[in-house]
Amino acid sequence: MLPPDPGQAGAVQPPQDPRPLLRLEVGRLRVRESRRLFDPSVHVGRLAGPRRSFVFRAQDRPVMDRGLRVEVMCSLLDEHEEDLAGTVAWLVRPGVPEVSDLDLEWQSAAGFAFATRELRPAGFYVVTRGGWLDVRTGESRVWKRLRL
């Protein structure tokens, strides 16, 4: 725990390393989703913790324009019952953890939705059955056999 900042009411929690939590998210996805192709979902909340989610069918992607993605992200933020500071957004999708157009589209929508609340997301990640990707930094991790 860091000492209190004079401009804040209480102590500041150090940022938590997201890598173990992302590993856990990959493991949970592998347990619940055995199919190679499944509908993507976007989440807002805490990795390996409380979250709000939206699942969209792959066949509906053509109608998911930027405005609708922003509305979905704003709605997820409105439904999130915890303090939004430190909140992350992540996309769960099939495929490999490499940057795709879908990732960038949802990252943009998340950034805009957070900005309307004068916040920045603590991270934007992609989780697949094979691993995870930090879309902002390009850091990723891939497993052939993940043991939790």
Label the predicted regions.
Residues 45, 90-92, 125-127:
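Short beta-strand segments
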Residues 52-59, 135-138:
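Short amphipathic beta-strand/extended segments with alternating polar/hydrophobic composition
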Residues 1-49, 55:
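N-terminal, charge-rich interaction modules
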Residues 59-102:
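Short HxH-centered metal-ligating active-site micro-motif
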Residues 25-30, 76-80, 110-117:
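Hydrophobic, Leu/Ile/Phe/Ala-enriched alpha-helical segments that form helix-helix packing faces
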Residues 38-41, 85-86, 122:
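Short, surface-exposed beta-edge/turn micro-motifs
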Residues 1-11, 15, 19-22, 108-148:
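Divalent-metal-activated hydrolytic enzyme cores
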Residues 99-111:
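Short Gly/Thr/Asp-enriched flexible loops that form oxyanion-binding sites at enzyme active sites
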